[in-house]
Every structure is written in structure tokens, then in C-alpha cells.
């Protein structure tokens, strides 16, 4: 959510930011509705004061049958009617303003490049060495040949975009989760938590998922939503709180299953594990003061990069352009991993700086150490990493011509010293 006071003072800057995203200007509408709303509030307050004075004067009239008493009563009645009319109009204006404000995206950072789509994103760096693999197989071919990636059985019980991982691939998934969290907690000082995977609508609103992306999540019949990312519960830990500046920044890491309806993804990545309704993800989250937030954004991104470095996976860092950046994001880096079978980079992590956008929705504040002033915090989050896509990257980048897959060295201790994943000779199902 944006600050209405800032919009009043900077309407042109708002429209400029919206224009970079390809959105029509709305500052005139906002300022007009806001002005009418403030006028209504002023009129209501004036009438309430007048009513109070008249009601007080009634107490000094001892003859309740007098003309003066009757006139004042009639005046108070008319004032009440007028207040009711104005309050109805005020509610209408507040609703109109709220609808516009709730659908306003975050301001784009000054260093975010202009662009209309992902083709105009800016590659900042490429890391790692791309191996020359002759006739590389797709991850789903490798998984099937190993006998450890079962889409058919999953589809029978759950429909499309689900998978069952078996034996060493299930073990690899567990190893990756533990490895990622160990790196983030021991090397980058993130604090591990295990949050709920079901939340109420207000928690989704606080991070910017609602109302705009209501159809992107799964909703239960009892008023819950399955989280699309651990960003939702982690951000809401600090909702309606005021933290002390000396306690900041706070860095959290969590592994959760994530659930997405993938509305609008028909025909995209229909084969394999790239786009699933359910997937595991290790999420990084930081809450910080505005003066620390840019540094913390770079720090969080570096933590996500470190996983790719340790696993020996080629990747690149991409700065998203104004037309590709997320609704709530101020600035975003995508980490894209190399997939040999697709002969291209694919997103494996998205790290975003949200400035005060989410904090204003969730009322997350801090008290300055010296001045004791209370201000809104800044939030930052990113994948560290998406576990399923990391499995994909390992299968494709570490595939061998005999059908086996080499386990990255950093994961071997997490897999009992195992060095290779070889095809199953028999399976229980």
C-alpha cells in the first residue's frame, strides 16, 4: 500500500511509476476522491460540534414545553439527519478510494530499467561453467529412466501438475532442504522457523496477494487459503507490531510446501516439475529499517546465490524491468539456473525488495533508537531456493551418459556419503 500523503505531494511521480509498469495514471482520481472525503469528514466534524453545543444548551432550558426547547430539538434532529447523509457519502468515498489504493502496485525503484516484458530484463552477471553435455535429456526423462519420478500415479489421485518422487529423488529432496537451511542459518545468520501453511485472507492482503491475485491461490470452504509462498506467514509474524530499532534487522528462513493454482499457465511447462500446483521451497525473509534495507536486499540475494555456487550450478542474476516486476515489489533480482535440455536459463529464485509497501498493509513498524519516532519497516524476501527446480537443475547438469546422476559434492554428507543416483532395478510401486 502506498502512502496517501505522499501521493498528495507527488502525483506526477506516482503516474510516472505507473507509466513504467504500463498502467494508466490515476493520481487525479485519487486526489479528487481523497479531497471530497476530507471535505466530508470536516463537514461531519463541524456538524457534530454544532450538535454538541445545541445538546448542551438544552440542559439549561427548564421548561421542556417551551418553544426554545422544541426548536433546539428540531435542530438536533435535522443535524442528525444531515450527519447520517454525509456519513453514507463518506463510506462511499472511502470504499472507492480503498478499491483504487488496494490495486495500486508498489513504486518502481529508480534503478529498475524500463521495459514492457521479460525480454527487456537486464542480465547483471553470469556465474559458473556450462558443461558440454552431448544429447542432454530433460529432467522428466531422467527421472522416469531412474524409476523415481512418477507423474502418472500422482495424476490419478490429484490431477495434472503433481508428482511423486521415489527413493533417491525423495532422499535428494530432503537433503536439499536440510543443506539449504544449514547454509542460511550457519553462514548467513538467518533464524529458522516453521510457520503455518494455511492463512486467513487478511494475511494474504498484507503481502499484496489480495485482492488482485485472489484466483492464484487455493481457498478452502472454511475461510482459509493455502500459502503460495512462505513469504505470507513470515511477513505476517510482524503484523500490527512495533519493533525496537536496535533489534533490527531480523532475518528468517523457513521451508514450507507451497500451493498455486497456476491460473493463466495453460499450455506452459506442461511436462515435468517446472510448474506444479504443490512444490517445496526454502524461503528467506528480512525485515529492516529503510536505511538498512538496500544492504539487506543484496545480502539476502547473496545467500540465495551461495546455494547455487556450492552446488556447482551455472546461473545468472537478472534485474527485472518495470514491466516484469511483481505487483508489490520495488525492485527484483531473479536468479536463473542453466538447464541443458532446454538450452536456456530458467528462474529458480526471485528476490524482492518491497520497501514499505507490505509494512503499510500489515502495520509493521519500528521505533527509532534516538528520536523514538515510529516509522514503517521495509520487507525483503526471496527463494533460497525452490527445491523442485533445484532437483531439476541437478538432474540435468549432473546427468551421465549411462543414465546415472552424480550427486553434487556438498550434498553427499546429507545422503549418507552416496555419490551416484542409479536407476532402480525394482520398486514397491
Swiss-Prot record:
Listed name of the protein: Serine--tRNA ligase
Record comment regarding domains: Consists of two distinct domains, a catalytic core and a N-terminal extension that is involved in tRNA binding.
PROSITE patterns in UniProt: AA_TRNA_LIGASE_II
Family that this chain belongs to: Belongs to the class-II aminoacyl-tRNA synthetase family. Type-1 seryl-tRNA synthetase subfamily.
Subunit relationships: Homodimer. The tRNA molecule binds across the dimer.
PANTHER family hit by this protein: SERINE--TRNA LIGASE, SERYL-TRNA SYNTHETASE
Pfam families noted in UniProt: Seryl_tRNA_N, tRNA-synt_2b
UniProt: L-serine binding residues: 229-231, 283, 383
Catalysed transformations (reactions): tRNA(Ser) + L-serine + ATP = L-seryl-tRNA(Ser) + AMP + diphosphate + H(+); tRNA(Sec) + L-serine + ATP = L-seryl-tRNA(Sec) + AMP + diphosphate + H(+)
Keywords: Aminoacyl-tRNA synthetase, ATP-binding, Cytoplasm, Ligase, Nucleotide-binding, Protein biosynthesis
UniProt xrefs under Gene3D superfamilies: Bira Bifunctional Protein, Domain 2, Serine-tRNA synthetase, tRNA binding domain
Lineage: Bacteria, Pseudomonadati, Pseudomonadota, Alphaproteobacteria, Rickettsiales
GO MF annotation list: ATP binding; serine-tRNA ligase activity
Name of the top EC class for this enzyme: ligase
Entry function: Catalyzes the attachment of serine to tRNA(Ser). Is also able to aminoacylate tRNA(Sec) with serine, to form the misacylated tRNA L-seryl-tRNA(Sec), which will be further converted into selenocysteinyl-tRNA(Sec).
Annotated ATP binding sites: 260-262, 347-350
EC number: 6.1.1.11
GO annotations of cellular component type: cytoplasm
Subcellular location as annotated: Cytoplasm
Gene Ontology biological-process annotations: selenocysteine biosynthetic process; seryl-tRNA aminoacylation
Amino acid at each position: 500500500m502506498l502512502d496517501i500523503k505522499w501521493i498528495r505531494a507527488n502525483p506526477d511521480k506516482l503516474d510516472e511509476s505507473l507509466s513504467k509498469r504500463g498502467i494508466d495514471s490515476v493520481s487525479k482520481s485519487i486526489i479528487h476522491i481523497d479531497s471530497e472525503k476530507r471535505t466530508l469528514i470536516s463537514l461531519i466534524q463541524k456538524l457534530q460540534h454544532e450538535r454538541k453545543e445545541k445538546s448542551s444548551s438544552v440542559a439549561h432550558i427548564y421548561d421542556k414545553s417551551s418553544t426554545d426547547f422544541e426548536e433546539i430539538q428540531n435542530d438536533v434532529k435535522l443535524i442528525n439527519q444531515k450527519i447520517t447523509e454525509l456519513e453514507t457519502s463518506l463510506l462511499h468515498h472511502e470504499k472507492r478510494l480503498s478499491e483504487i489504493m488496494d490495486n495500486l502496485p508498489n513504486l518502481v525503484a529508480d534503478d529498475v530499467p524500463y521495459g514492457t516484458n521479460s525480454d527487456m530484463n537486464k542480465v547483471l552477471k553470469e556465474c559458473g561453467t556450462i558443461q558440454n553435455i552431448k544429447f542432454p535429456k530433460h529432467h522428466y526423462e531422467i527421472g522416469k529412466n531412474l524409476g523415481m519420478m512418477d507423474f502418472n500415479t500422482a495424476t490419478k489421485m490429484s490431477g495434472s501438475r503433481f508428482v511423486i518422487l521415489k527413493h533417491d529423488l525423495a532422499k535428494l529432496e530432503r537433503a536439499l532442504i536440510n543443506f539449504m537451511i544449514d547454509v542460511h542459518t550457519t553462514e548467513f545468520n538467518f533464524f529458522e522457523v516453521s510457520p503455518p501453511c494455511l492463512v486467513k485472507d487478511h494475511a494474504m492482503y498484507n503481502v499484496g496477494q489480495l485482492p488482485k491475485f485472489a484466483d492464484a491461490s487455493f481457498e478452502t470452504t472454511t475461510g482459509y487459503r493455502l500459502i503460495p509462498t512462505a513469504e505470507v506467514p513470515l511477513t505476517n509474524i510482524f503484523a500490527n507490531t512495533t519493533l525496537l530499532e536496535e533489534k533490527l534487522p531480523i532475518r528468517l528462513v523457513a521451508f514450507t510446501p507451497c500451493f498455486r493454482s497456476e491460473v493463466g499457465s495453460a499450455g506452459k511447462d506442461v511436462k515435468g516439475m517446472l510448474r506444479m500446483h504443490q512444490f517445496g521451497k526454502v524461503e528467506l525473509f528480512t525485515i529492516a529499517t529503510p536505511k538498512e534495507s538496500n544492504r539487506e536486499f543484496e545480502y539476502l540475494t547473496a545467500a540465495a546465490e551461495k546455494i547455487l555456487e556450492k552446488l556447482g550450478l551455472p546461473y545468472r542474476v537478472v534485474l527485472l524491468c518495470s514491466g516484469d516486476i511483481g505487483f508489490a515489489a520495488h525492485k527484483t533480482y531473479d536468479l536463473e539456473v542453466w538447464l541443458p535440455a532446454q538450452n536456456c536459463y530458467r528462474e529458480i529464485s526471485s528476490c524482492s525488495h518491497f520497501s514499505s509497501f507490505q509494512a503499510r498493509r500489515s502495520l509493521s513498524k519500528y521505533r527509532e533508537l534516538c528520536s523514538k519516532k515510529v516509522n514503517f519497516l521495509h520487507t525483503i524476501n526471496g527463494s533460497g531456493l525452490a527445491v523442485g527446480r533445484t532437483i531439476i537443475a541437478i538432474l540435468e547438469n549432473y546427468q551421465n551418459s549411462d543414465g546415472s546422476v552424480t550427486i553434487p559434492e556438498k550434498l553427499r554428507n546429507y545422503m549418507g556419503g552416496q555419490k551416484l543416483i542409479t536407476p532402480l532395478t525394482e520398486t514397491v510401486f
